[in-house]
From Swiss-Prot:
NCBIfam families: sphingomy (TIGR03395). Residues 84-119 have a biased composition (Low complexity). Residues 1-37 form the signal peptide. It is an enzyme of class 3 (hydrolase). One of its GO terms (cellular component) is extracellular region. This is Sphingomyelinase C 1. Residues 68-77 have a biased composition (Polar residues). It is found in: Secreted. CDD domains: nSMase. Pfam families: Exo_endo_phos. It comes from Leptospira interrogans serogroup Icterohaemorrhagiae serovar Lai (strain 56601). It catalyses: a sphingomyelin + H2O = phosphocholine + an N-acylsphing-4-enine + H(+). InterPro entries: Endo/exonu/phosph_ase_sf (IPR036691), Endo/exonuclease/phosphatase (IPR005135), Sph/SMPD2-like (IPR038772), Sphingomyelinase/PLipase_C (IPR017766). Residues 64-119 are annotated as: Disordered.
Length: 597
């Protein structure tokens, strides 16, 4: 039954009469103000009118305060009945079937003028990077160069000029200390790593335990004050290697210039063969945990909520679209390199996931139920370290991680990467024999197949990456004669080496996984820096007879066009090659970026 509250009608009518009188007076005053503005000596008249208008306006404000539902707790009820309250709420919300609202809520574009765009008016720049720093006590990983890579990440340029950084996969204690301490001056506000301790958190939720061998590896650092820190431990990470980790997510509330940003950083269940089909199910449960947590926080609609991290969900898959729906987030505008785990360009990824195809797994997403920026871009970037690092077994690399980082931002600016960072001067070079004018190439069918100078056409198999491991600079502008590691550009981590059983006991050359010839060298016959068109020869050490010999293109029989270690002194056309640098420019996505105009 609809009932009315017992309010004297005279009071209600008087209130509307007062409002009517005020509006009439204001209208008359403004008309008089307009007329007097055209007359001399108008200043005093105008000031008097403005004072009157201000008084009327303040009076109206006071009347509103007096009528506020917060003035008297006993009267903190709407004048309409409960049913009309619900009806009003529904009337104010756009309906899917309402012809005045042509867009459905799920397709509503990001709108800078929407009431939910308050905190988005102040831009936020956030970086997410899964840095593959597993603890050494897990035997399946061991030495990954964690501490050396931490040093290089801390001093790198790709982590500069951000508001927030979310690191995932940072479970190595010493590497964590090195990295966080070195970046503290730029990012002074830091969380603890998820899952190690309850100290330093405002709250610890979920299935926290002290028994796992490793923490959850997620850390958030910020240029701006962190007002709240919560860690949540998943209770369903029980598949494969993840069962040994306290995996979960970190939540922080950040205050940037008075505006609040809410960030969740996480690393979901890994994609492991040991998990069979259960990995996707576990990730769904973990996404449910994240969404339930966000809902429980009752975050104001005009504040931005970001969900970021190594989500281990392949972009474009059914699982990906389920994630977008479950989290109720907008798809970002994707720019940059096409994959974040790229086994074709990232040697560290290729080393540990040799059989995997390149995939995109890392995201920075914006909740649709909260403040919306005018646009939201995710840029996957492929930087390399300026200096190389070495593992204890001698493996040398310039990769920061097996994953590429992702930037999240509204508009690009002068600090936004616009080109691939993975293009080195002496990558994807080719060698053309001066004897038969053919290019050296790796085997098309076998990663560890023979090297042969047998094609006149440049292909992916004729390209090789050069690295001088005794030179710390990863991308030198000048490479001179000397010791060199030659890697197939197509088969990453497969290096030139010899097999002494080829052709009745001779040194035949092929590409071998993670094992290049220690004594292989390159000689620039034109002297100076290696450049496009340089004439070069390759030499190596004879481990049986002793002494250095040059590699030659065999010219007869069943081993014709194979490479052998053969000539010691005199160089003929069979031992001389033209070096061709790769003339292709690095991938450029500057035209795909959106800048503020």
């Amino acid at each position: 039954m609809i009932t009315k509250r017992n309010i004297p009608p005279c009071k209600k009518n008087w209130k509307y009469k007062k409002k009517s009188i005020s509006l009439t007076l204001i209208t008359i005053c403004y008309m008089f103000l307009f007329l007097t503005s055209c007359k001399p000596g108008k200043k005093n008249s105008i000031n008097l009118l403005l004072l009157l208008l201000n008084t009327l306006d303040n009076k109206n404000v006071n009347e509103k305060i007096e009528d506020s539902t917060n003035t008297d707790p006993s009267s903190n009820v709407n004048e309409e009945d409960e049913n009309s309250i619900n009806a009003n709420a529904n009337d104010n919300a756009p309906s899917d079937s309402d012809s005045s609202n042509p867009r459905s809520p799920d397709k509503n574009p990001v709108n800078p003028t929407s009431p939910n765009s308050s905190s988005a008016d102040i831009g936020i720049k956030i970086l997410s990077h899964s840095i593959f720093m597993a603890p050494t006590n897990l035997s399946s990983w061991g030495d990954l160069g964690q501490e050396e890579r931490a040093q290089r990440i801390a001093s790198s340029s790709y982590i500069k000029n951000q508001d927030i950084i979310v690191f995932e996969g940072l479970s190595h204690n010493n590497a964590e200390k090195i990295l966080l301490e070195k970046i503290r001056s730029e990012y002074p506000y830091q969380t603890n790593v998820v899952g190690r301790t309850k100290k330093g958190w405002n709250a610890t939720l979920g299935a926290y335990t002290t028994s796992p061998m490793a923490n959850g590896g997620v850390i958030i650092v910020s240029k701006w004050p962190i007002e709240e820190k919560v860690q949540y431990i998943f209770n369903n990470s029980n598949c494969g290697q993840d069962q040994y980790y306290n995996k979960g997510f970190a939540y922080v509330k950040i205050n940037k210039d008075g505006k609040k940003f809410h960030v969740i950083g996480t690393q979901l269940q890994a994609r492991e063969p040991d998990c069979f089909n259960s990995g996707e199910t576990i990730r769904k449960l973990q996404l449910n945990d994240i969404k339930s947590f966000i809902d429980s926080k009752d975050i104001p609609k005009d504040e931005t909520v970001l969900i970021t991290g190594d989500l281990n969900i392949i972009k474009g898959s059914n699982e990906y679209f389920d994630m977008i729906s479950k989290l109720n987030v907008n798809e970002p505008r994707y720019v940059g390199v096409p994959f974040t785990l790229d086994t074709k360009t990232n040697a560290l990824a290729a080393y540990y996931y040799e059989k995997e195809k390149p995939i995109y797994l890392d995201y920075i997403l914006v909740s649709k139920l909260h403040a919306q920026p005018p646009v939201w871009q995710n840029l996957a970037y492929d930087p390399i370290s300026n200096t190389t690092w070495k593992r204890s077994d001698g493996y040398t690399s310039y990769e920061f991680s097996d994953r590429y980082p992702v930037y999240g931002f509204i508009y690009a600016d002068s600090s936004t990467p616009t080109k691939s960072g993975h293009k080195r001067k002496y990558d994807q070079v080719s060698f053309q024999s001066t004897f038969n004018r053919k290019f050296i190439q790796a085997d098309h069918n076998k990663k560890d197949g023979w090297l042969k100078a047998d094609t006149r056409i440049k292909t992916d198999f004729t390209k090789f990456n050069l690295l001088q491991e005794n030179v710390s600079e990863s991308n030198p502008s000048c490479m001179n004669s000397g010791s060199v590691r030659i890697e197939s550009s197509y088969y990453l981590n497969y290096y030139w080496n010899w097999f002494i059983g080829a052709a009745s006991g001779d040194y035949g050359y092929y590409t071998k996984f993670n094992n290049g010839s220690d004594s292989l060298g390159i000689k620039n016959l034109d002297n100076g820096c290696l450049k496009d068109g340089s004439r070069v020869a390759f030499y190596d050490w004879d481990t049986i007879g002793g002494g250095y010999y040059y590699l030659t293109v065999w010219d007869k029989g069943s081993w014709k066009e194979h490479l052998f270690l053969w000539v010691q002194s005199f160089l003929s056309s069979r031992e001389i090659f033209y070096l061709h640098l790769d003339s292709n420019p690095p991938k450029d996505w500057s035209k795909d970026l959106i800048y503020h105009h």
